[in-house]
């Protein structure tokens, strides 16, 4: 049975929140703690994997989310780990994570609508 897309979107939001929590003490603390770095990288990997599992139709209808970039960053982290710059990761945390969280939160209601259309239900209450 395929997981519901809401599960993947919830995973993305949960992992974003974890990264924000782990990095709340700022840049200096991030660069000083390899455990925090590893935790942040792992959560980015999970975000990318969850993004890959969102159906194409949903991704096409929500181009405001950088689906390809999320998946691609995951691949870089997994396959080219040595080449990953902690400065690049920090830049993403600092500049991209909150806007991504906001964008994901905004598109979740559209998933409910798409699933209603696919199932043939006209209204959320079934009437």
Name each model-derived stretch.
Residues 1-127:
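Solvent-exposed interaction patches of small proteins and small membrane subunits
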């Amino acid at each position: 049975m395929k997981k519901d897309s809401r599960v993947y979107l919830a995973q993305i939001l949960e992992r974003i929140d974890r990264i924000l929590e782990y990095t709340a003490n700022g840049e200096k603390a991030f660069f000083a703690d390899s455990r925090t770095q590893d935790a942040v990288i792992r959560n980015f990997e999970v975000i990318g994997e969850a993004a890959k599992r969102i159906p194409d139709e949903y991704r096409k209808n929500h181009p405001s989310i950088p689906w390809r970039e999320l998946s691609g960053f995951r691949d870089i982290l997994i396959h080219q780990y040595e080449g990953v710059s902690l400065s690049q990761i920090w830049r993403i945390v600092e500049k991209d994570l909150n806007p991504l969280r906001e964008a994901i939160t905004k598109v979740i209601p559209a998933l409910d609508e798409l699933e209603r259309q696919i199932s043939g239900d006209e209204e959320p209450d079934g009437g």
